[in-house]
Amino acid sequence: MLRVVLITGISGSGKSVALRLLEDAGFTCIDNLPVRFLAEFIANARDDAMERVAVAIDVRSPGELAELPDVITASRAMGTSLSVIFLDANTDTLVQRYSESRRRHPLTDRLARGGKTPSLAECIALERELMAPLRDQEHVIDTSDLTPGQLRAWIRDLIQADRPPLVLTFESFAYKRGVPSDADLMFDVRCLPNPYYDRTLRPLTGRDEPVATWLGGFDIVTQMIDDIAAFIRRWLPQYTQDTRNYLTVAIGCTGGQHRSVYVVEQLARRFSDHDPLLVRHRTQLPDDPA
C-alpha cells in the first residue's frame, strides 16, 4: 500500500526540517507541490508502485487550499494510507525565525498595497486564516519551543520511521596540511612517540606491521587509544539520538603517515561492530590507489 505523509502548516514552523527527515528515512519527497497536482501525483506514485511519499504544501497557492481536504478524503477512499502533519508556532517565534533567516514571507507580495510592504505579523495573520481548514486534519505540532533535532525526533516517532544508521568515520590527517573541515571530533596525537625518527620505519606507514608493533609497545599509545575509544563509546548514543546521520572522528599527527594512521586503524578494529563504519586516510599512503 502506498503511504503518503503530507507536511503542511505555517511558514517558518519547520516544514523543510520535517521534509529532510522524511527524505533521510527513505521517503520520496516533493516540496511546495500545488494542491491541484496532488491527486495526480498520488495516482502516479501508486501506479509506479512507490511505497513511501512525502509532500509539503504551503500557502503559495491560497486559492487551492480549500480543495485539499477533499483531495485527502478521495485519496484515502482509494486505499492510500495518508497522514497529515500540520506544523505551527506562535507569532513571536515565527517573527524571530524570519528575522534570523532574513527571508521574505510568501504572502508579502499578495498583501502589498500602493507600494506599501505589509508587516510580517500581518502576513502571518493572513496565513493562519488561509490555513485554518487544514489545521484540524490530523496531527498538529507546535514547534515554538522545539529545536530542529527535537522536531525531527518527534516526527520520526509520529510516523514510526526507522532511524537511518549513523555512519561512523575514522580519518587520519596531517596537521602540516591543515585540519579537515568535515571533522565532528578531532584528536591530536602528536604527543605520541614518532616512528619517523627511526630510519627503518620512516618510509613505512601506520598500517605496516613494524610500525604497528613499534607504536603498540608504548603504554602511552595504548592509553591514548583507550581514552579516545571510551569517549566515543560513551557519547555515540547521544550523537545518534541527536538524529545526525554522520559522525566523523579525525585523528591528526604531523605528517599523517604513522601515528594518526595507526590510531585510526586501531579505533576501526575496536568499533568493527558498528555498521556502517568507514576508514579514510587523507595522506596518500604508498599502497593507496593513485
Curated annotation (Swiss-Prot):
Keyword Repeat attributed: no
Swiss-Prot/TrEMBL keywords: ATP-binding, GTP-binding, Nucleotide-binding
UniProt binding sites for GTP: D58, V59, R60, S61
Disulfides per UniProt: none
Entry's family note: Belongs to the RapZ-like family.
Function statement: Displays ATPase and GTPase activities.
Protein name per the record: Nucleotide-binding protein BP0690
